[in-house]
């Protein structure tokens, strides 16, 4: 069962029978973390060093990757298996921006979901690091991440992608349709944002501000797109 909340009932809690912490069911938090773990491991994957070249040419992705029919299938199955989990940051941000922005419980619930996505991604990265030998974060980014800078076209792309993805997500009520939308617009919606955050936090947080700002601002732009789509739909 793939649960999609409409803007009118976006703050309705998922009844899974666990204890409440910060307005969010503990089982729901574990569900979100487990889903993020599975998707990070099986879909986002891990870049391993093959010893056939330098750190750029001699690497191999150990995972499905965010492209193709297998990625769509994996995400679709994940949303059905982990019913109620958002799994990806853009989905959570769309629910935030189309819900009641004055509802503190909703903010706590969605904030906890974002945190659990990072925790789940971090656990998957730890496991994969033990399973495979590969380049370190320092090898991949020897000079660190570039400072984040506002770009109007990037923001506009995120808003447009968010509007389209929310229409797909809220109107089709179908995990496969949402998965197709995410894969088609993965770069614009920041689908791998939680894993990027997890990787940065596990590597001394040297690039905290660039990665954090990109994670937040991409999410906000996607959420604004979802809000825009909702307002347009309400006034047609």
Please give the residue ranges for each predicted region:
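Membrane-interface helix-loop junctions and terminal tails of multi-pass membrane proteins
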Residues: 1-236
């Amino acid at each position: 069962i793939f649960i999609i909340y409409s803007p009118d009932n976006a703050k309705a809690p998922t009844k899974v029978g666990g204890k409440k912490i910060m307005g969010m069911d503990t089982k729901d938090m574990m569900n979100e973390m487990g889903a993020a773990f599975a998707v990070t491991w099986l879909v986002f994957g891990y870049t391993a060093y093959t010893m056939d070249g330098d750190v750029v040419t001699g690497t191999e992705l150990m995972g499905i990757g965010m492209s193709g029919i297998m990625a769509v299938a994996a995400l679709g199955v994940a949303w059905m298996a982990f019913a109620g989990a958002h799994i990806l940051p853009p989905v959570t941000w769309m629910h935030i921006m189309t819900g009641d922005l004055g509802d503190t419980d909703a903010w706590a619930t969605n904030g906890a979901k974002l945190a659990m996505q990072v925790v789940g991604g971090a656990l998957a990265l730890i496991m994969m690091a033990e399973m495979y030998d590969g380049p370190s974060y320092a090898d991949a980014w020897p000079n660190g991440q570039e400072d984040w800078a506002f770009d109007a076209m990037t923001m506009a792309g995120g808003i447009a992608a968010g509007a389209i993805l929310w229409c797909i997500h809220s109107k089709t009520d179908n995990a496969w349709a949402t998965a197709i939308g995410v894969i088609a617009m993965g770069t614009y919606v920041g689908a791998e944002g939680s894993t990027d955050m997890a990787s940065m936090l596990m590597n001394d947080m040297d690039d905290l501000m660039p990665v954090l700002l990109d994670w937040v601002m991409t999410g906000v732009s996607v959420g604004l797109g979802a809000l825009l789509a909702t307002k347009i739909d309400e006034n047609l």
